[in-house]
Amino acid sequence: MTTAAQIPGLEAAPTKHARLVAWVREIAELTQPERVEWCDGSEAEFDRLTSLLIEKGTLVRLNDEKRPNSFYAASDPSDVARVEDRTYICSEKAEDAGPTNNWMDPAEMRVKLQGLFEGSMRGRTMYVVPFCMGPLGSHISALGVEITDSPYVVISMRTMTRMGAPALEQLGEDGFFVPAVHSLGAPLESGAADVPWPCNTTKYITHFPETREIWSYGSGYGGNALLGKKCYALRIASVMARDEGWLAEHMLILKLTSPAGKVHYIAAAFPSACGKTNLAMLIPTLPGWKAETVGDDIAWMRFGEDGRLYAVNPEAGFFGVAPGTGEQTNPNAIKTLWGNTVFTNVARTDDGDVWWEGLTKQAPGHLTDWKGRDWTPESTEPAAHPNARFTVPAGQCPTIASEWQDPKGVPISAILFGGRRATAVPLVTEAPDWRRGVFFGSIVASETTAAQAGAIGKLRRDPFAMLPFCGYNMADYFAHWLEVGQKADQAKLPRIYYVNWFRKSPEGKFLWPGFGENSRVLAWIVGRLEGHADGVETPLGVLPTRDALPTDGLQIDEADLDALLTVDIDVWKQEAELIPEHYQTFGDRLPAALWAEHEALVSRLDG
């Protein structure tokens, strides 16, 4: 076995952080790489690594005239998405992981990982990637170091985080960091040929909440391999937030300026495929309103000295789903992707650009699909994988807010929760207090089957849009939200709203046009925050009056508008009957306050 002293580059650590240096040495001895590189995040390093990846066949440089400094990657067809069934929360006690997470005894998992990681980087370079989640120097930010044997991960981390020398400098000689180890699980024996996308059929994405560690094996794909994203910024950070009294959330952050010049910041949590990025990059249809982007996916929120809740976007880039993103749905995203972008599992055009379903109304006559095959509009499979991605610097977004890197964060005025609901849930409902808002967050769901008229389809619950990302028992997470609200100055807490852009008629037609028209709902919310928009009390909460929701210039049927702005008592009685089954999943750890909210809803519906 090679000792640490024999591994080139290991002793060249550009830091005096003793714990970091010792940990890197320990992982090098375990994984046995050919050499170690300490990443500085420089442009020269990026250029060197992209050239290496082109040489290996992992990346293809796109046409510089069409897409400057941009690249295309195609993954192994077995490695295309997050692997929820291989994602573990290894808390000391199983009950602390809770019923919504996979748990394994940490001692057992460590033995398993030890066996998998032993020699797993043989024949490869081990990269040490220091990074900062959130603006450098912010009291809301936190540091991490990822060790990886994937240069694709290194270049992606440079886009998605503040990576390299500045993060290492911030760490100093004894600063706290989350250690994150990633291996493709594809050691290269001497003289063996590599493949363009190395990975392993065995995959483990593991989190140790008490020790704040992340270990990921076998996947080179996004959320499994870019460990600053879901693994740190949500699963580990949610545990840190619980212990330290803050919030780490799966939320966009939007800056809204009214025609009167008043600014409000709004955070919103929606499950995937419910329009989070589209709302984050909203182009308002209402005259005089301006929307700007602070973040599209994750928010870290702490109370400031003035008692208000301040949020930062811990990421530095967007890791977005390409299919469905087009001029019609999200023109700002399309403008963001002009260059400096890595596209993964999209299709390639004959002139060296990229394409995916939804980019244009008509597909090109010929493409190379994500599996490298010829594709024409007559082909039976999509040209791009449905989870094809783009990785792009957030600063390129034309609507990026000037405050997006403000170390103080931005003060949140309102928090939105919502799922994809064809039935029951009105367009927008205001919670009368924080507790009702937490109740709304706890019951968020999307309908996975079509509903019959007057009935509810099959629901997939995704409380707070955190189901795949909460790093501890979700019942304790609800309790944490309730506690955060109890301790705060009630007058300064953000107001909470339950929204639904996806109501359908019995015939299956969307009742609300969505996209830029959602600015009308935001205008009513701002009106409520400022005390000049009317609402009507319902058993669910406060809904807009017909006159209070700005509908000028909107082509919408009166009956559809009525359905959007009504709480159907009979349907909501059915909805309320479905909640206990969801709550019982959490057993006696579910906060009594949420059962009380449910009982109060039932009694208001009966009233």
UniProtKB/Swiss-Prot annotation:
Q: What does this protein do?
A: Catalyzes the conversion of oxaloacetate (OAA) to phosphoenolpyruvate (PEP), the rate-limiting step in the metabolic pathway that produces glucose from lactate and other precursors derived from the citric acid cycle.
Q: Which cofactor does it need?
A: Mn(2+)
The gene designation is: pckG
What span is annotated as the signal peptide, if there is one? none
Q: Which organism is it from?
A: Frankia alni (strain DSM 45986 / CECT 9034 / ACN14a)
Q: What taxonomic ancestry is recorded?
A: Bacteria, Bacillati, Actinomycetota, Actinomycetes, Frankiales
Residue positions binding GTP: 273-278, 389, 420, 515-518
> What name appears for this protein in its UniProt entry?
Phosphoenolpyruvate carboxykinase [GTP]
One GO BP annotation here?
cellular response to glucose stimulus
Residue sites binding substrate per the record? 82, 221-223, 272, 387-389
Q: Catalyses which reaction?
A: oxaloacetate + GTP = phosphoenolpyruvate + GDP + CO2
Q: Which family does it belong to?
A: Belongs to the phosphoenolpyruvate carboxykinase [GTP] family.
| PANTHER family xrefs | PHOSPHOENOLPYRUVATE CARBOXYKINASE, PHOSPHOENOLPYRUVATE CARBOXYKINASE [GTP]-RELATED
The lineage's top-level taxon is Bacteria
